[in-house]
UniProtKB/Swiss-Prot annotation:
Belongs to the DXR family. GO terms for biological process: isopentenyl diphosphate biosynthetic process, methylerythritol 4-phosphate pathway involved in terpenoid biosynthetic process. It catalyses: 2-C-methyl-D-erythritol 4-phosphate + NADP(+) = 1-deoxy-D-xylulose 5-phosphate + NADPH + H(+). Its EC number is 1.1.1.267. It comes from Idiomarina loihiensis (strain ATCC BAA-735 / DSM 15497 / L2-TR). This is 1-deoxy-D-xylulose 5-phosphate reductoisomerase. The keyword Metal-binding applies. 1-deoxy-D-xylulose 5-phosphate binds at residues 124, 150-151, 185, 208, 221, 226-227, 230.
């Protein structure tokens, strides 16, 4: 019986994780669930899974949850950053699903890493912001990182077993690997005329053709900044050089990523676009767990197509690739600027193509040395958010 903490339990990844966990009651026990402010959704999860602890983002949210639960469960309700760190690092916890969206997920995920847990990494921003620092912490503590993002999980599955034991430190060439190929659908706007991009609405951006995701990640998919963040994450997870990492658009989302070997072989992980598959893989690794996902019916796949992403259509992707090799300060600043810009777009304060403009402006304005501590990274994050908000204020005038 393995005890699990789910960070970001009310989100898409969190709920899919609990869906898989509930299929294996003899293998998993829910130790703690966390959420920011989704009180009613959290109450339902607490009643269903009866965690030992539930953590909310604020005192008021915790008080409301406690009142709503009443005597229905024995769950102890807590709130705040310290409580997040505690349920991530508690001695009773075996596995932590790191699924808090955004920079807010970094600190509790690092707490789990420092405590030597098995960390199922679904939070892109942890590696985007902290990169080498994150990997160094895992090396020191002996924590095991298993990627959950469909693309990184796909690559992980296609690696030799020896490389799977060296997340963050592997030498790809020593394992006969030429390069890694990240696939992306291209989002809902991949085929519309470029001149129509500025008019696209939040509703259209969130209408992903293949995947069911949260609103923020759906917008990131539309700009392909999501793929840019995954590119940065892959650089750190698999210790890539620039020529060992490529991105290709694959509209059908059947192949989730590929590994090109030096002998000419290509290994690809395929499956239905359902996050329960990589979640089940990460939960069960190295064994396989039933996930509830139907197998692929190859007779129903009409075609598998691929193309290069257009720089004009996806400027956010290009910004992310350049930031990846510029330094940790750049990826941290880009992530922060994007979070601010996407939030403004979802509130219809800026247009779709303004997201890239905000990100580019912030990267141009920030002067930073290499980030070598969590405090420095958080300071850069704050500086970038201030710069992004300044851009938005000037835009509104």
């Amino acid at each position: 019986m393995r005890r699990i903490t789910v960070l970001g339990a009310t989100g898409s990844i969190g709920q899919n994780t609990l869906n898989v966990v509930s299929r294996h009651p003899d293998d998993f026990q829910v130790f703690a669930l966390t959420a920011h402010s989704q009180i009613s959704a959290m109450a339902e999860l607490c009643v269903k899974h009866n965690p030992q602890y539930a953590v909310m983002g604020s005192y008021n949210a915790a008080a409301e949850l406690k009142a709503l639960l009443g005597q229905q469960t024995s769950t102890q309700v807590m709130y705040g950053d310290q409580a997040l760190a505690e349920v991530s690092s508690d001695a009773e916890v075996d596995v932590v699903m790191a699924a808090i969206v955004g920079a807010a997920g970094l600190s509790p995920t690092l707490a789990a890493i420092d405590a030597g847990k098995d960390v199922l990494l679904a939070n892109k921003e942890a590696l985007v912001m902290s990169g080498q620092l994150f990997i160094d912490h895992a090396q020191r503590s002996g924590a095991r990182i298993i990627p959950v993002d469909s693309e990184h999980n796909a690559i992980f599955q296609c690696l030799p077993q020896a490389a799977q034991q060296q997340v963050g430190t592997m030498a790809l060439a020593e394992h006969g690997i030429q390069y890694l190929l990240l696939t992306g659908s291209g989002g809902p706007f991949r085929d519309i005329p470029l001149e129509e991009l500025p008019q696209q609405t939040p509703g259209a951006a969130c209408n992903h053709p293949n995947w069911s995701m949260g609103r923020k990640i759906s917008v990131d998919s539309a700009t392909m900044l999501n793929k840019g963040l995954e590119y940065i994450e892959a650089r750190w997870l698999f210790n890539c050089s620039r020529d060992q990492l490529k991105v290709v658009i694959h509209p059908q989302s059947v192949i989730h990523s590929m590994v090109q070997y030096t002998d000419g072989s290509v290994l690809a992980q395929m499956g239905e676009p359902d996050m329960r598959t990589p979640i089940a893989h990460s939960l069960g690794y190295p064994e396989r767990l039933e996930s509830g996902v139907a197998g692929l019916d190859f007779t129903q796949i009409a075609e598998l197509t691929f193309k290069q992403p257009e720089a004009q259509r996806y400027p956010c992707l290009q910004l992310a690739i350049e930031a990846c090799w510029e330094g940790q300060w750049a990826t941290t600043a880009l992530n922060a600027a994007n979070e601010v810009a996407v939030a403004a777009f979802l509130q219809e304060q800026v247009g779709f193509t303004d997201i890239a403009k905000v990100c580019d402006s912030v990267l141009q304005s920030i002067q930073a040395d290499e980030a070598d501590s969590l405090e420095t990274l958080l300071a850069i994050d704050k500086q970038a958010r201030l710069a992004a908000n300044k851009w938005l204020q000037e835009y509104a005038q």
